[in-house]
UniProtKB/Swiss-Prot annotation:
Binding locations of Mg(2+): 72
Protein name: dITP/XTP pyrophosphatase
CDD domains, per the entry: HAM1
Names of the cofactor(s): Mg(2+)
Species assigned in the record: Corynebacterium glutamicum (strain R)
Assigned keywords, A-Z: Hydrolase, Magnesium, Metal-binding, Nucleotide metabolism, Nucleotide-binding
GO MF annotations, alphabetized: dITP diphosphatase activity; ITP diphosphatase activity; metal ion binding; nucleotide binding; ribonucleoside triphosphate phosphatase activity; XTP diphosphatase activity
SUPFAM superfamilies for the chain: ITPase-like
Length: 206
C-alpha cells in the first residue's frame, strides 16, 4: 500500500515512518510530495487545524489517487488566547522561518510571569482515502513556554517548549528530547498513532 504524506518536511516524514515501523506496518510505502507528480498545493485558509489538515489531505488524494495523510499543527499560548494557533508557521509574517517566529513569540511573552506561560502543541491529522472516507485524530501536548531557546533537535517552536512531563524534572525542552521520547509524548505522535489502526485495515484490504 502506498501512503502519501502531504508534506515535504523531512522531519515530519521521518516521524511518521518511525511510527509506522513501530506499529509493524512494513507493507506501507510512505511517499512525500516530492515523490508524486507535482500539483498546486492548496491555500491553507481554514480557521482551525482540522480545516487545514482536511484541505491538504483532500488535495493530495484528489490529485494522486493515493491514500493521503496531512497534518496541521502549531502552538497555542494561553496568555495569547490560543495564538499563534493556525498561524504558527507564519507568525512573524514569513512562512516557515522558525527563528523569526520564535523571536517574535518570545518578545510578546517577555514580561509574562512563569505562572502564566502555559502553552500546548496541537496537531490534527487527517487520513483521506480514494473512496472519499476521511478519518481525523487530534493530539495535544501540554507544557509551558521557556524564556529562551534550548536544544538543537526538533523544529518549529520545540526549543521554546518545556513539556509538562519535564516540569519539575530534568527541565528539558522538546528540542532536547530524543526522537523516540518525542514520538511517545508529542501532539503529532498522539494524532498519528490514532490513525495507525485504520491505516493497518486499509493496508490489509489492499
Amino acid at each position: 500500500m502506498k501512503l502519501l504524506l502531504a508534506s515535504n518536511n523531512a522531519k515530519k516524514l521521518k516521524e511518521l515512518q518511525r511510527i509506522l515501523d513501530q506499529a509493524g506496518l512494513d507493507s506501507v510505502e510512505l511517499l512525500a510530495l516530492r515523490d508524486v507528480e507535482a500539483y498546486d498545493e492548496p491555500i491553507e485558509d481554514g480557521r482551525t487545524f482540522a480545516d487545514n489538515a482536511q484541505i491538504k489531505a483532500r488535495a493530495g488524494v484528489a490529485h494522486t489517487g493515493i491514500a493521503t495523510i496531512a497534518d496541521d499543527s502549531g502552538i497555542a499560548v494561553e496568555e495569547l488566547n490560543g495564538m499563534p494557533g493556525v498561524l504558527s508557521a507564519r507568525w512573524s509574517g514569513a512562512h516557515g522561518n522558525d527563528t523569526a517566529n520564535n523571536e517574535l513569540l518570545l518578545a510578546q511573552m517577555e514580561h509574562v510571569p512563569d505562572e502564566r506561560r502555559n502553552a500546548a502543541f496541537v496537531s490534527v491529522c487527517v487520513l483521506a482515502l480514494p473512496d472519499g472516507q476521511e478519518f481525523v485524530q487530534e493530539g495535544r501536548w501540554e507544557g509551558q513556554l521557556l524564556r529562551g531557546p534550548k536544544g538543537e533537535n526538533g523544529f518549529g517552536y520545540d526549543p521554546l517548549f518545556i513539556p509538562a512531563e519535564e516540569i519539575g524534572g530534568q527541565g528539558r525542552s522538546s528540542a532536547e528530547l530524543s526522537a523516540e521520547e518525542k514520538d511517545a509524548l508529542s501532539h503529532r505522535g498522539q494524532a498519528l498513532r490514532g490513525l495507525v489502526e485504520k491505516i493497518a485495515q486499509v493496508a490489509a484490504a489492499s
